[in-house]
């Protein structure tokens, strides 16, 4: 994370010499992503509250969310935990990655931003013969 701090300092120097818009939002994204964790391997019984409780000993948890299937409402087995500072997030990774939570071994690492490729709600995507298919 020292890299992020150094990058932040370099970018701030550039900000003082140019407009704040894009660089400021980029700094915010870097800071946000460096304190947001992906938590995989969650049991079906883990909810937002129990996920947050499992991570509060490492620092102030600003958000804890278990991702659910849109149609069934059932947990998809992963979630995200956000901390107010990146040191807390780093400590949580060190201490919780590979540990057991609600009977399942979990994986904990820094969250990465989703790719910006648009997602189609009409299926598609290949299969035999290529062409994608699906949709209207």
From Swiss-Prot:
<feature type="domain" description="RRM">
    <location>
        <begin position="35"/>
        <end position="113"/>
    </location>
</feature>
<feature type="region of interest" description="Glycine-rich (GR) required for cell-to-cell movement">
    <location>
        <begin position="123"/>
        <end position="135"/>
    </location>
</feature>
<dbReference type="GO" id="GO:0009651">
    <property type="term" value="P:response to salt stress"/>
</dbReference>
<comment type="subunit">
    <text>Binds to small phloem-mobile single-stranded RNAs (ss-sRNA, e.g. small interfering RNA (siRNA) and microRNA (miRNA)) in the phloeme exudate, including viral-derived sRNA (vsiRNA).</text>
</comment>
<dbReference type="GO" id="GO:0003697">
    <property type="term" value="F:single-stranded DNA binding"/>
</dbReference>
<feature type="region of interest" description="Disordered">
    <location>
        <begin position="113"/>
        <end position="136"/>
    </location>
</feature>
<dbReference type="GO" id="GO:0005615">
    <property type="term" value="C:extracellular space"/>
</dbReference>
<dbReference type="InterPro" id="IPR052462">
    <property type="entry name" value="SLIRP/GR-RBP-like"/>
</dbReference>
<dbReference type="GO" id="GO:0006858">
    <property type="term" value="P:extracellular transport"/>
</dbReference>
<dbReference type="GO" id="GO:1900864">
    <property type="term" value="P:mitochondrial RNA modification"/>
</dbReference>
<protein>
    <recommendedName>
        <fullName>Glycine-rich RNA-binding protein 4, mitochondrial</fullName>
    </recommendedName>
</protein>
<comment type="similarity">
    <text>Belongs to the GR-RBP family.</text>
</comment>
<feature type="transit peptide" description="Mitochondrion">
    <location>
        <begin position="1"/>
        <end position="33"/>
    </location>
</feature>
<keyword id="KW-0964">Secreted</keyword>
<dbReference type="InterPro" id="IPR048289">
    <property type="entry name" value="RRM2_NsCP33-like"/>
</dbReference>
<dbReference type="GO" id="GO:0009414">
    <property type="term" value="P:response to water deprivation"/>
</dbReference>
<keyword id="KW-0694">RNA-binding</keyword>
<dbReference type="GO" id="GO:0035197">
    <property type="term" value="F:siRNA binding"/>
</dbReference>
<keyword id="KW-0496">Mitochondrion</keyword>
<dbReference type="GO" id="GO:0009409">
    <property type="term" value="P:response to cold"/>
</dbReference>
<dbReference type="GO" id="GO:0003690">
    <property type="term" value="F:double-stranded DNA binding"/>
</dbReference>
<dbReference type="InterPro" id="IPR035979">
    <property type="entry name" value="RBD_domain_sf"/>
</dbReference>
<dbReference type="GO" id="GO:0050688">
    <property type="term" value="P:regulation of defense response to virus"/>
</dbReference>
<comment type="function">
    <text>Possibly has a role in RNA transcription or processing during stress. Binds sequence non-specifically to RNAs and DNAs. Mediates cell-to-cell trafficking of RNA interference (RNAi) signals (small RNAs (sRNA), e.g. small interfering RNA (siRNA) and microRNA (miRNA)) which regulate growth and development, as well as responses to environmental inputs, including pathogen attack; can compromise zucchini yellow mosaic virus (ZYMV) and tobacco rattle virus (TRV) infections at the early stage.</text>
</comment>
<feature type="modified residue" description="Phosphoserine">
    <location>
        <position position="43"/>
    </location>
</feature>
<dbReference type="GO" id="GO:0003727">
    <property type="term" value="F:single-stranded RNA binding"/>
</dbReference>
<dbReference type="GO" id="GO:0005739">
    <property type="term" value="C:mitochondrion"/>
</dbReference>
<dbReference type="GO" id="GO:0035198">
    <property type="term" value="F:miRNA binding"/>
</dbReference>
<dbReference type="GO" id="GO:0050658">
    <property type="term" value="P:RNA transport"/>
</dbReference>
<keyword id="KW-0809">Transit peptide</keyword>
<dbReference type="GO" id="GO:0003723">
    <property type="term" value="F:RNA binding"/>
</dbReference>
<keyword id="KW-0597">Phosphoprotein</keyword>
<dbReference type="GO" id="GO:0005829">
    <property type="term" value="C:cytosol"/>
</dbReference>
<dbReference type="InterPro" id="IPR000504">
    <property type="entry name" value="RRM_dom"/>
</dbReference>
<dbReference type="InterPro" id="IPR012677">
    <property type="entry name" value="Nucleotide-bd_a/b_plait_sf"/>
</dbReference>
<dbReference type="GO" id="GO:1990428">
    <property type="term" value="P:miRNA transport"/>
</dbReference>
<dbReference type="Pfam" id="PF00076">
    <property type="entry name" value="RRM_1"/>
</dbReference>
<feature type="compositionally biased region" description="Gly residues">
    <location>
        <begin position="122"/>
        <end position="136"/>
    </location>
</feature>
<dbReference type="GO" id="GO:0006970">
    <property type="term" value="P:response to osmotic stress"/>
</dbReference>
């Amino acid at each position: 994370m020292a890299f992020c701090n150094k990058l932040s300092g370099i970018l701030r120097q550039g900000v003082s010499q140019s407009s704040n818009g894009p660089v400021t939002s980029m700094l915010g994204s870097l800071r946000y992503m460096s304190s947001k964790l992906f938590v995989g391997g969650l049991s079906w019984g883990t909810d937002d509250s129990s996920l947050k409780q499992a991570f509060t000993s490492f620092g102030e948890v600003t958000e804890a969310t278990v991702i659910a299937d849109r149609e069934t409402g059932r947990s998809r087995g992963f979630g995200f935990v956000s901390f107010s500072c990146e040191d807390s997030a780093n400590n949580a990774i060190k201490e919780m990655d590979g540990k057991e939570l609600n009977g399942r071994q979990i994986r904990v690492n820094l969250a990465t931003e989703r790719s910006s490729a648009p997602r189609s709600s009409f299926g598609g995507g290949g299969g035999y013969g290529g062409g994608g298919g699906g949709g209207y």
